[in-house]
Amino acid sequence: MNDFKLPIYKYKDELIKVLKNHNVLIVESPTGSGKTTQLPRIIYEAGFAKLGKIGVTQPRRIATVSIAEYIAKHIGVNVGEEVGYKIRFEEITSPKTKIKLMTDGVLLQELKKDTLLYEYDVIIIDEAHERSLNIDFILGLIKDISRKRDDFKIIVSSATINTKIFSKYFNNAPVVSIETITYPVQIIYNPPLLNTSKGMILKIKEIVLNVIKEKKAGDILIFLSGEKEIKETIKELQELNSKKNLIIFPLYGRMPKEAQEQIFMTTPKNKRKIIVSTNIAETSITIENIKIVIDSGKVKTNKFQTKTHTYSLQEVPISKSSATQRAGRAGRLSKGTCYRLYKREDYQLREDYQKEEIYRTDLSEVVLRMADIGIRDFTHFDFISKPSTHSIQTASKILKSLDAINNKNELTEIGKYMILFPLIPAHSRALVEAMINYPQAIYQTTIGLSFLSTSGIFLLPQNEEMEARQAHLKYKNPMGDLIGFVNIFEDFKKALNKEAFTKENYLDLQGLEEIANVQMQLENIISKLNIPIIQKGVFDNEGYLKSIMRGMRDYICFKTSKKKYKTIKAQNVIIHPGSLISTDSVKYFVAGEIIETTKMYARSIGVLKKEWIDDIILNEEFKHNDISSKENQITNTGQTKIINEIKIGKKIFKAEYKNNIYVIKINLETLKEIIFKNELNNQNNEDLKKIKIQLMHKNITVFNNKKFLETIEIVKNMGKDWHCIKKYETKNVNIDEPEKMKNLLECTMQFISFPPKKNALFLSLETDYSGNFRLKPKQNFIMAIEESIESIKSLIENKEYIQKLHFIKKLINKVYKKLNYFF
């Protein structure tokens, strides 16, 4: 493609003229105008980098590297000469470099050394509409620089999303709007029959199949909320690829550069390319020949809970603005089609713009950077969107608990070391602890933190769950997952064929390569401080875990009941079933992560001794931070019940309306019919959120007053054969009784009647960990699930048991998958 034909070149003279006359310029345009690749070149060739550089920030590493390579190629130089880049742990620049691409995090690192950015004549903030925490912080810092440097130019480059806010923030800075030719995109609202992950994937498969059958032209771009959903969807779509005419690629942030670059390949003749992506493809990159978009309408966000210092992972609806951007991907080159997997009414109820990250994240990293560059009044920093005072105060308290800042909001000596590492404060504090007090554990700590800084590496392929779990068990350690991480790393490093190693052990190759890269760079930073790193000899596991514990202070967990723990701030923490640790014996541990999904789950466990904890956490803290179990209880207000009729699927039910909630009674078989005959196709999800259910089987209450959508998820996953059984094996069954074990597994999580109260009891699989298993009725469904998955894990983890039960391998995988769904 001829770059000079891109829409931005029609505005070249205007851009140069405005930038000469103003220090701040806002550029808005849709994706595909050429602003990302051509704006730096236009500014460079116009002579705006005579003394310094043009710095260009990108939110993501993939874009940083690929854009640098593109600009260098089209200017006619090698990367590292006039055009270079710098990302976390990698820099390719030289004294000749005039255009420097970098992630926004890198620019923040540079700001601490060069607070007025004298290295740069121009800073371009690209993708500013994403409004990440780093972008918002950078905007505040460079606004201050513009007051102090008359020669400093700022360009804020954004998609056509609320650009007025940028102009207003920079004292009504001029806006140049670049128009592009866009083609009409037909919007088709086509929600799945059931609004579940599986329902969404099947709907995508159906749409793709129809596109293929109807021989519609062009490649397909599918937007999903996360990596897990992407992998599951690709697995389902591969079933349509028997003729090998589909080229299916995933696209998400942590993929290596080589894998991500494949998506830009020209689609071969008689082939169709399908890209299954997160919101990274919404505005950041341009993929040619996309004519069909399938939009799930969802995105995943992490929300920091200031009360508990934990995160809740939420899948939320995208905004109208994001929906427009996604649809626009189909209309860049010709007419296109966008299938929205939600209803028109749902779209109309959505927010205009996505909520900015600054309102939902931990601000301790930003506050630490403020302290590093000499800002002392954290609460009055000039953010484009001001966070709450409470959020800033919480961040300050976290940093003080890590010994990173003092009462004057200045960096301590420990804080000065922490700021050297491109890690979150909790992680950098752990590394500094090892450097100061446990030098023998520095190497292990760099490995552990590298694992905690990246996404999970343990794979559980469909129908191979049992084999994968057994492979992972090789790295089970009584001191926890954190020790296992070190052993995985060492084996990966030694492996001559790393791809074969990861395949054999059901580990993610790309993830481990990323971990190795991060670990190496952490070592490099430490080495520059002339601190020796001991890699050989006996590892200091105690020093390693104590170091992690010091950084992750808020994630130190104390046992409160059989399977529950609490931290200083949070109650009812549960070890995630994916952990390789045996939970029953663990009284104290530190978690690498605590995140709330259906429950508050701790991951990446390191087992602690009580005496290690006493120096860090005083027991008194628990007394002052108890969370009342009575909090948030629903009380009966005595309001009058109102009887209504409500339609679900094709059936009408009587409903009691009370406290803004409908309560209906449904028979299990009726609900199965509604679900499995896809009768919920035209049901408004917002209406279903207002319904609670009494689920019955004949005269037995299966669930009482349970959220309707939650009940649908349970019944859908448990399947058509979920039923009440009259007889089951009540005695212990030994592993040497394979037929009886088969019966036990078939009955696991079925339910029985409890005559006195006519309530259902769920058959939980339990074990004595000595080869004996039994079914135990439980009133609580989730507790029965938790107990069952622990028991089946103990079964899978014993090779001798599996050999004896090899003939029911499919059944074991099926039960494990069913149980694992709830986590």
UniProtKB/Swiss-Prot annotation:
Source organism, top-level taxon: Bacteria
Effect of a null allele: Disruption of the gene results in the modulation of the expression of about 180 proteins and in a complete loss in the ability of the spirochetes to infect mice by needle inoculation.
Record-annotated Helicase ATP-binding domain positions: 16-179
E.C. no: 3.6.4.13
Record keyword Cell inner membrane present: no
SUPFAM superfamilies on file: P-loop containing nucleoside triphosphate hydrolases
Reactions catalysed, as given in the entry: ATP + H2O = ADP + phosphate + H(+)
Keyword Nucleotide-binding belongs to the record: yes
Alphabetized GO MF terms: ATP binding; ATP hydrolysis activity; RNA binding; RNA helicase activity
Positions that bind ATP: S29, P30, T31, G32, S33, G34, K35, T36
Motif DEAH box per UniProt: ranges: 126-129
Keywords, sorted A to Z: ATP-binding, Helicase, Hydrolase, Nucleotide-binding, Virulence
Record field: transmembrane: none
Coiled-coil segments: none
Effect of S158A: Strong decrease of ATPase activity in the presence of poly(A). Strong decrease of helicase activity. Slight delay in the infection in mice
Residue intervals of the Helicase C-terminal domain: 203-374
Effect of substituting I285A: 4-fold decrease of ATPase activity in the presence of poly(A). ATPase activity is not affected in the absence of poly(A). Almost loss of helicase activity. Decrease of infectivity in mice
Top EC class, one word: hydrolase
Reported function: Has RNA-stimulated ATPase activity and RNA helicase activity. Involved in global regulation of gene expression. Could be involved in RNA processing and post-transcriptional gene regulation. Essential for both tick transmission and mouse infection.
Annotated family: Belongs to the DEAD box helicase family. DEAH subfamily.
The protein, known as: ATP-dependent RNA helicase HrpA
Lineage: Bacteria, Pseudomonadati, Spirochaetota, Spirochaetia, Spirochaetales
Gene: hrpA
